């Protein structure tokens, strides 16, 4: 699985004007299941992200996790993280998991983040979503399982 993690002051996701999820301080996690991924990869990535120390401590150093700060997570599916741009001008997405697997793993990943004690909001798999965020830092991290 691939994830792009952004430390945010706030974030929200809407579909056709309907607010699906919003958070205050925490993490916006854009996630993509790849060919061959399973629940083990989703669980491992969620556990790593839950422990990722990218929030400032009292000394101003990035030494606290989203759990440590009481922050939340907004988890949004984004198959375009599987883009292959090595040839031509049009990205290919064949490395992404098939839609049924992608949706199952996206839901599993979000549930695993929540199981880590992090309040979790989500988007809608496969929908044309509008994501708003106020990046804090900015801090943006790329992770793969």
Swiss-Prot record:
Signal peptide, first to last residue: none
A Pfam family that the UniProt record links to this protein: Tyr_Deacylase
Top-level enzyme category: hydrolase
GO biological process: D-amino acid catabolic process
Transmembrane segment boundaries: none
Keyword vocabulary terms for this entry: Cytoplasm, Hydrolase, RNA-binding, tRNA-binding
HAMAP family: Deacylase_Dtd
Protein name: D-aminoacyl-tRNA deacylase
